[in-house]
A protein has these predicted regions:
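A conserved short coil-to-beta-strand element within the FAD-binding core of flavoproteins
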Residues: 165-180, 387-405
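Conserved N-terminal/central alpha/beta ligand/cofactor-binding core
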Residues: 124-154, 158, 308-362
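Feature captures the FAD/FMN-dependent oxidoreductase FAD-binding
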Residues: 137-208
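Beta1-alpha1 glycine-rich phosphate/pyrophosphate-binding loop at the start
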Residues: 9, 19, 37, 66-69, ...
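Extreme N-terminal leader/targeting segments of oxidoreductases
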Residues: 1-71, 89-93, 114, 194, ...
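C-terminal, flexible cofactor-proximal segment of oxidoreductases
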Residues: 22, 279, 308, 449, ...
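Rossmann-like dinucleotide-binding core of oxidoreductases
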Residues: 61-68, 72-73, 78-95, 102-104, ...
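Central helical "cap/lid" subdomain
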Residues: 215-226, 400-453
Length: 620
């Protein structure tokens, strides 16, 4: 569906660029109608004799040049929905389609339905900055609530007009002859396959949808129920069952206390990796609000709804708290040392009933090397009588249970694999760029990117939550918004300047990797731990800096870091058009620059006292 409103045809259609260009454009843009001399209000906008002595002929379009483009977005989670809001807001004449393989929106929050699934950062920091929700039930809201928030955001901003659900991407191929992406799509409800094309392709799949099963001998020989945390069987009754759980990451930390509380369950938790379990993020704010536990009372939620200033102040404190702990990620800082001591004391207290578990689970590496999670109820569950903490390595899986290296068979009725995802990997479908290079081949040694959002050899392809995109502290949704804003600026440049291919230089990708490697040397992420952030000794998952650093880095694109292919024109200044603007042709808002929303009035008597630029340095 086209992002509305579109401009009148005379404003965006291409006129003749030079005497032999018609054939070129007919071949490159067969579906684009063009006229040689558009008129508006009874006069032609083209000069009667606009050919210069060099043979240059004006491109008969207004300076804004909002030529038609097609954009395909893969994924309807936080990132895809953001594009469904901002592209129609900021761009015109863009035909936008958002494909998602699921039956509903929300991405990972639609797919993950295991018991206890929730965000492990404060809910009010895990939302769009422009669409705050005062009604979160908990400091760590459950998955269904997050999915409902995303669905309501889709409805609020009419994003559903662009979304096609149950549409699975099968392949994406760059066609250099037409400068288009050819995307093969399968409708899952009918098994019909078709091909779509786009000028720009945005991968908004995220990193939490390609399931990673454990590589253990005999996994499929188990005769009982087996499920992955991301492929949960909601119909299975765990009551009175012996449950084996493999994993100690974020999902396992949420699943274990949920299953432990069910009637007559017996849990065998196979945990090899040591990990830090932090106190709840935002604990000081909870104490200030007088919260008993993590649930917001009805009175507190009503206060958020009825008092915008109070709600905004609460949000500000949460965000500031997340951003002020960046020093925790740097080796040797006082904050890092203090955090480790605090975590040790907190974990000892919560594991006091079985102190030996503390010795088994306490890491040798610094807090933050692995992803920190508060894990409400996790440590408390480990000390309960119906939970066995097993550190022995798994040798194999048999039909009746799990055999550890000491030869013991741990009989179970159901096996839960909380083993995460293939993060930082290419999509599970072929993506082919210049000269037939596949992304899997391109990333064979390392997932490479430029500022996390583009990679060389793949023109007009942008990534949300690509390599080196996650954050060690602060707001992930602000990272998503910042990357999305950058991508939309790129689309506008492509549209306005008659660019048909835009690809980051390989040298700039190499420079970004060199910067990233140098930055991470002094961080806790290079400590001795096993983390999805890393591939060997290289950090591939995290942004090399703080969230505020990322927001500023993406604020003003360095256009010189890209290579461009243009429409065949005699002069690359043809983007200047015919000397007219859209406002003049439409006869409206001819002095818009005097309207209050476009005015930037300096402070008197000292312009440098402008408070906005004291908070944040000016940039364009």
């Amino acid at each position: 569906m086209s992002a509305v409103p579109n401009l009148p045809e005379p404003i965006h259609q291409n006129g003749t660029l030079e005497h032999d260009l018609d054939a070129v454009l007919d071949q490159a843009l067969p579906k684009t109608k063009r006229i040689d001399s558009p008129t508006q209000a009874g006069f032609s906008t083209a000069s009667s004799n606009n050919a210069s002595s060099t043979g240059f002929k004006l491109h008969d379009t207004v300076i804004e040049n909002q030529r038609p483009l097609k954009v395909i977005v893969v994924g309807a989670g936080y990132s895809g929905i953001y594009h469904g809001i901002r592209i129609p807001e900021r761009l015109r004449n863009v035909d936008l389609t958002i494909y998602d393989k699921n039956a509903g929106v929300g991405g990972t929050w639609f797919e993950n339905r295991y018991p206890g699934c929730a965000c492990d950062i404060p809910s009010h920091s895990y939302q769009y900055s422009f669409n705050p929700n005062p009604n979160w039930s908990s400091m760590y809201s459950p998955a269904p609530e997050i999915q409902a928030y995303l669905a309501s955001t889709v409805k609020k901003y009419s994003v559903d007009r662009f979304i096609k659900l149950q549409h699975e991407i099968k392949s994406c191929n760059w066609d250099a002859n037409t400068s288009k992406w050819k995307v093969k799509v399968k409708k899952l409800d009918t098994d019909e396959e078709f091909e779509d094309t786009s000028d720009v392709l945005i991968m908004a799949r995220g990193g939490l949808n390609h399931i990673a099963w454990p590589q253990i001998d005999g996994l499929r020989s188990f005769k009982g129920e087996i499920m992955h945390s991301a492929a949960w069987n909601q119909d299975y009754d765990f009551t009175n069952k012996r449950i084996g759980i493999i994993g100690s990451g974020s999902s396992a930390i949420q699943i274990i206390p949920s299953l432990q509380r069910l009637p007559k369950t017996q849990l065998s938790c196979f945990i090899r990796s040591r990990t830090w379990i932090s106190p709840p993020f935002g604990q000081a704010i909870q104490d200030e609000l007088g919260m008993d536990g993590f649930t917001f009372s009805e009175e507190q939620r009503k206060k958020f709804q009825s008092d915008p200033d109070h709600f905004h102040a609460f949000r500000m404190k949460l965000e500031e708290g997340g951003n002020e702990i960046h020093a925790l990620t740097i080796k040797g800082t006082e904050m890092q040392k203090g955090a480790q001591k605090h975590f040790e004391e907190n974990m000892k207290q919560r594991l006091a009933k079985k102190p030996e578990i503390y010795e088994w689970i306490k890491p040798d590496f610094a807090p933050g090397c692995r992803r920190l999670t508060p894990g409400p109820g996790f440590l408390e569950a480990l000390v309960e009588d119906n939970v066995s903490f097993i550190r022995d390595r798994i040798a194999r899986i048999e039909d009746k249970g799990i055999v550890t290296e000491d030869g013991k068979l741990h009989s179970i009725d159901v096996l839960v694999c909380a083993t995460g995802f293939h993060t930082g990997a290419p999509p599970p479908f072929p993506v082919t760029g210049i000269d037939g290079k596949e992304l899997t081949q391109h990333w064979d040694q390392r997932a490479t990117s430029y500022l996390s959002l583009a990679t060389d050899a793949f023109p007009n392809l942008f990534m949300m939550l690509g390599p080196n995109s996650a954050i060690g502290s602060g707001s992930l949704t602000m990272m998503i918004e910042s990357v999305g804003d950058y991508v939309i600026k790129c689309i506008r440049k492509i549209q306005k300047e008659n660019i048909y291919s835009m690809v980051v230089k390989s040298s700039r990708v190499a420079d970004f990797l060199a910067y990233s490697d140098a930055y991470f040397k002094n961080t806790v992420f290079m400590d001795e731990c096993k983390s999805w952030y890393r591939k060997g000794d290289i950090v591939t998952g995290l942004w090399p800096g703080s969230t505020l650093h990322c927001i500023e880095a993406l604020r003003s694109p360095r256009w010189e870091d890209f290579e461009y292919g243009y429409a065949e024109e005699v002069n690359q200044m043809a983007w200047l058009g015919n000397g007219w603007s859209t406002n003049q042709l439409e006869g409206r808002d001819l002095a818009f620059y005097l309207m209050p929303q476009f005015q930037q009035v300096p402070v008197s008597p000292l312009p440098e006292d402008n408070g906005e630029f004291k908070i944040r340095a000016w940039s364009q």
